[in-house]
């Protein structure tokens, strides 16, 4: 079985998202990535997810962990996974340069302490489910019902798409200030919860996951233009092995001390 995704197509999707999203804001990136992936047929969605996993796994080596520690004030297994999601979203050139030497990350506009993008690693899952939900809403007459009840809020199918996307990507956001918007949100959430589709991607992935030959073929294509990673231990002095990134972080720290944190700032 060949996966319906190539490295060039994968990175072209990432580039389209980067051209539209606020790349300092994970929420913005997730929404634009979701919208792009919703356009893909299911086999390409699976391929995109497999390519994402492959690139994320490839970036797992000690010096990259050190870079994550400098940028995010430490790391862990889960936090490092989330950091590599952010890394992928920086695009092919940035990813490749970081694979050559993680110190090259210093050339990027880095949102220090905010590059652990957990949600981006799950967007293929959400997009697959979103496709299923749109079909379900239409087939069961839910879409027509919602359009009748909320004509001021749902003026097109794009508005319903937005409502479903928000419940998938940001289910725990603050309550709406307008009663009608909150009621629409509550109904959309109810229909998603009762659809039985929330975890449909798990079944799809299990039934269609690539075999060893397909994985090997895919990865030989993906990694052909990437450097070979040498086995090494975790560096002891980050400032020595990643001097440019270390200096950039120190400069960022110094700049922050010049101003008091704004009210409500988390970190």
Name every feature range the model reports, one short phrase each.
Residues 1-42:
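N-terminal leader/targeting peptides and immediately adjacent processing regions
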């Amino acid at each position: 079985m060949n996966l319906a995704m190539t490295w060039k197509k994968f990175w072209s999707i990432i580039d389209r998202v980067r051209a539209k999203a606020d790349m300092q804001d994970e929420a913005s990136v997730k929404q634009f990535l979701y919208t792009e992936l919703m356009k893909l047929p299911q086999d390409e969605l699976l391929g995109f997810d497999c390519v994402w996993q492959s690139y994320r796994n490839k970036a797992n080596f000690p010096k990259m962990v050190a870079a994550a520690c400098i940028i995010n004030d430490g790391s862990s297994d889960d936090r490092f996974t989330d950091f590599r999601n952010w890394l992928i979203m920086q695009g092919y050139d940035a990813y490749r340069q970081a694979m050559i030497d993680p110190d090259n990350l210093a050339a990027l506009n880095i949102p220090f302490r905010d590059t652990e993008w957990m949600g981006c690693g799950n967007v293929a899952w959400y997009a697959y489910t979103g496709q299923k939900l749109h079909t379900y809403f239409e087939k069961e007459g839910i879409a027509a019902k919602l359009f009748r009840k909320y004509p001021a809020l749902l003026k097109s199918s794009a508005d319903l798409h937005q409502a479903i996307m928000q419940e998938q990507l940001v289910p725990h956001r603050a309550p709406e200030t307008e009663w009608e918007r909150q009621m629409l949100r509550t109904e959309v959430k109810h229909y998603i919860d009762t659809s039985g589709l929330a975890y449909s991607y798990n079944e799809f992935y299990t039934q269609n996951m690539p075999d060893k030959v397909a994985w090997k073929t895919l990865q030989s294509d993906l990694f052909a233009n990437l450097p070979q990673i040498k086995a090494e231990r975790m560096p002891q002095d980050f400032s020595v092995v990643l001097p440019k990134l270390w200096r950039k972080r120190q400069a960022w720290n110094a700049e922050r001390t010049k101003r008091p944190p704004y009210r409500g700032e988390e970190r």
